[in-house]
Amino acid sequence: LYLGPKRTYTAEQISEICQRPGVVLEDCDDSKVVELLIDKNIVSIFQGQSENGPRALGNRSILFDPRVQDGKDIVNGVKHREWFRPFAGSVMEEHAKEWFDMASLDSSPYMMYAVKVLDEKVSVIPSVTHVDNTCRIQTVNKDQNENYYNLIEAFYKKTGVPIVFNTSFNLAGEPLVENLY
């Protein structure tokens, strides 16, 4: 799942990166990330080893608040993606059935399935709900990715929504960001 190189950077390297125009780099705890999301900021997550495969699963991800009506347009503007491409929701595994029609699925840790958003939840998470009222979901539990789970849990405690908008930390047509340079 997370098979890429584990990157570490010295304080000097991080300081050098932060000197570039337009770069804001913060090492912050979950509560700060949640506040940034609630304030409609796009947050990039770069932690641990990168994902192996076509989906960003919380280690090289761009996150946004799924409750924002025009969230798709905001993130598409940054990523230069086509308007019709759906975004994913990363959901705390134990809450997935409260938000999505999981049918016979117990989990979807690799973001392999698009499932129907429950009718009463569509208006709550418009940024991750596609035009056909489905969402490509990633269920997250502590064993799979404790740091990412804790972040989603912090968002849930603050908003009542156990889901974050998740897309890959890259631009259209480019590979996942693998280093900060």
Listing of model-derived features with the role each one plays in the protein:
Residues 1-181:
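Flexible beta->alpha loop and helix N-cap segments adjacent to enzyme active/binding sites
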